[in-house]
Amino acid sequence: LNQTFQNFEIIIIYDDLDLFDLDYILEKQKIDKRITVIKNNKNIGAGFSRNKGISISNGKYIAFLDCDDCWHPEKLEKQLNFMKDNKISFSFTSYDVINSKGEIIKNKKAPKKIMFKNLLIDCNIGLSTVILEKRLINDSCQFPNLKTKEDFVLWLKISKKTDLYGIDVSLAKWRKLNNSLSSNFFQKLIDGFRVYNRY
């Protein structure tokens, strides 16, 4: 909520069977009418939850923020200005990797541009850094049902339509937790084989 650019809506897809923080979120919704909360009746996974959020969104642009991550206060303003000034439809930024205490342990730099062939070699795109035009998402181009790498699959599909542009400024923080799906080496390996076999 603490962004210098304030013309946005927040769509929270609650996909956790543990309801420990749902009341807090609903209280925030009462205070700020820009917030919409959708609680899934059953766990459908991150990819399908994001698709659901995108489908009910109203804006021209879509940005993502996972629950463990956080944005720099100027992220939306700087990134949207960059996209409008350069007439591009997909952008991402550098980001800091932090531990459970919030300490920066490394910085991931964003390359200036990524094309499909580059993306197959290495995905340097942090999900919570991405802003894209909603028109890029449709029934044949959306998040798949994978436990990990679902964002990688979508970026591959989009990179066949347009180049992906990076901003080498850290505008987000990604929290690395040892028990998170994004940190699960074996699950990432399995899903990685599935992705590469398909593309």
Question: Language-model features: where?
Answer:
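Conserved nucleotide-sugar donor-binding catalytic segment
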Residues: 107, 111-188, 195
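Conserved short acidic donor-positioning loop in nucleotide-sugar-dependent glycosyltransferases
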Residues: 13-17, 44, 67
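Acidic donor-binding segment of Leloir-type glycosyltransferases
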Residues: 1-39
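Short aromatic/hydrophobic "clamp" motif used to bind/position activated sugar donors
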Residues: 62
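Glycine-rich, basic loop-to-helix element that forms the pyrophosphate-binding segment
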Residues: 40-57
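The conserved acidic donor/metal-binding loop of glycosyltransferases
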Residues: 66-70, 94
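Acidic donor-diphosphate engagement hotspot in glycosyltransferases and nucleotidyltransferases
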Residues: 21-22, 50, 71-76, 101-102
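Conserved donor NDP-sugar-binding/catalytic core segment of glycosyltransferases
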Residues: 74-105
